[in-house]
Amino acid sequence: MKQKVTKEKITNHQKAAKTRRQRGYQWEDTIVKRFKKTENWKAFRLGSPSIALPDVLAVNTEKSTIFTIEAKSGTSTSLPVPADQIERCLEWIKTFDIYKNKQVLLAFKFLSKKRIDVGVYENRELREFFKIWDEKLEISDCVCTYNGKIYSKINGV
């Protein structure tokens, strides 16, 4: 009996992980499509989570601008961004000397359903926020709330 419960738990965790990956991919894809619809912008998804790359790279050669974008999507009331993901975005834009304007964007999408419990949701307004990372700040974990406020997490708080 224990093995069966364990297998069910593993299956549920695998399903949840797959759903999170799909949400992330869809949000990244939406961002890429929005940039591509805008004149003189090109954008690309850069890879999977196993590779240390930003989620999206967007460039405008006419305006000499490049953005590395870390995209977060979810059903909770806050979406965290680990410091190492911000750091890799900063490292990437620093390698492109040809661009005069280089910025890291954090893109947050709070889905129209809020997770209350495992498999339990309530409806809410879909919200999106785009934040420019201030390079003068010390790199740290940060979190964006459903209200669009962004906070630095220090020692996990």
Residue ranges of model-derived segments:
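Alpha-helical scaffolding within the catalytic cores
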Residues: 12, 53-55
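Acidic-basic catalytic patches of nuclease active cores, encompassing PD-(D/E)XK
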Residues: 1-47
